[in-house]
Curated annotation (Swiss-Prot):
Further comment: The globins of the nematode parasite N.brasiliensis have oxygen affinities 100-fold higher than the rodent host's hemoglobins. Two isoforms are found, one located in the cuticle, and the other in the body of the nematode.
Gene from which this protein is expressed: GLBB
GO-annotated cellular components: cytoplasm
Major subcellular site: cytoplasm
Family assignment from sequence similarity: Belongs to the globin family.
Occurrences of domain Globin (ranges): 1-147
Species in which this protein is naturally found: Nippostrongylus brasiliensis (Rat hookworm)
GO molecular-function terms, A-Z: heme binding; iron ion binding; oxygen binding; oxygen carrier activity
SUPFAM superfamilies listed in its UniProt record: Globin-like
Keyword line: Cytoplasm, Heme, Iron, Metal-binding, Oxygen transport, Transport
Keyword Transcription regulation: no
Name assigned to this protein: Myoglobin
Record's subcellular location: Cytoplasm
Binding site for heme b: H96
Pfam family, one: Globin
Length: 154
């Protein structure tokens, strides 16, 4: 657990959460996401045809990106505290109930996240493995919470 946290945190230097950088890094994630995964834009009502330029100008994606970045930092920082980590996973699902997300996306997100980090700089093999482990545990808890809500789950 400690190695997973250590390696995830080390790679987060590529996605800083400082006051000066959080908003832009969050927008950068969604620009990367919309450019590389246009099929997933359908989950963002009103932004189904957004380009990276549209994301850059969007207050909505500034807020979404900042929130996503904060969530990823919280997950990495709490990975060695299983109760807090899993509670945050459940709360994440609770915030997304009713959005009709494909349950496979809760695991798939992490490969997109690693690819985003790689676009910002070098990510080591140990760091990739750490994100995969974190994503696996995250997904496991998310699938249990989806089931609790009676939603499709894997």
């Amino acid at each position: 657990m400690a190695d997973v946290k250590k390696n995830c945190l080390a790679s987060l230097s590529l996605a800083p959460i400082s006051k000066a950088q959080q908003a832009q890094v969050g927008k950068d994630f969604y620009k990367f996401f919309f450019t590389n995964h246009p099929d997933l834009r359908k989950y963002f009502k009103g932004a189904e045809n957004f380009t990276a330029d549209d994301v850059q100008k969007s207050d909505r994606f500034e807020k979404l990106g900042s929130g996503l970045l904060l969530s990823v930092h919280i997950l990495a920082n709490t990975f060695d505290n299983e109760d807090v980590f899993r509670a945050f996973c459940r709360e994440t699902i609770d915030r997304h109930v009713g959005r009709g997300l494909d349950p496979a996306l809760w695991k798939a997100f992490w490969s997109v996240w690693v690819a985003f980090l790689e676009s910002k700089g070098g990510v080591s093999g140990d760091q990739k493995a750490a994100w995969d482990k974190l994503g696996t545990v995250f997904n496991d808890e998310c699938q249990h919470q989806l089931a609790k809500h009676g939603l499709p789950h894997l």
